[in-house]
Amino acid sequence: MSSTLDTQHDVVVEKQPARTAPPPMYQVVLLNDDYTPMEFVVKVLQKFFGKNSEDATRIMLQVHHEGRAVCGVYPRDLAATRIAQVSQYARARQHPLQCIMEPA
């Protein structure tokens, strides 16, 4: 914190550091479908969400059994980017895999 002297009024004004709120976070949720192979889902989780083999398999099984699972939690722009990347990658390989973004 720094101080400055207001010479006209002989008052010391202390500057407060700027405070910024953390950005709102969003979870990326992978949705189940009847056509995308489980191995492909594991690959997507590893490639786009940085999951190791064990975590990717666990999330894939949750998607398979419960219909959905959270892949990660990110600021809005990064979550939207991950969704676009997954969608483009899946479509290019003829898979209907979908994910959505929800407030965390």
Curated annotation (Swiss-Prot):
Against SUPFAM superfamilies, the record matches this protein to: ClpS-like (SSF54736)
Question: In the UniProt record, what gene is named as encoding this protein?
Answer: clpS
Role summary: Involved in the modulation of the specificity of the ClpAP-mediated ATP-dependent protein degradation.
State the source organism's domain of life.
Bacteria
Task: Write down the Gene3D superfamilies for this protein, in alphabetical order.
Answer: 3.30.1390.10
Pfam entry (one): ClpS
Q: Which NCBIfam families does the entry link to? A: PRK00033.1-5 (NF000672)
Can you say what this protein is called? ATP-dependent Clp protease adapter protein ClpS
Q: How does it assemble?
A: Binds to the N-terminal domain of the chaperone ClpA.
InterPro entries in UniProt: ClpS (IPR022935), ClpS_core (IPR003769), Ribosomal_bL12_C/ClpS-like (IPR014719)
The family this protein is said to belong to: Belongs to the ClpS family.
What's an example Gene Ontology biological process for this entry? protein catabolic process
The taxonomic lineage of its organism, from the top, reads:
Bacteria, Pseudomonadati, Pseudomonadota, Betaproteobacteria, Burkholderiales
List each coiled-coil range: none
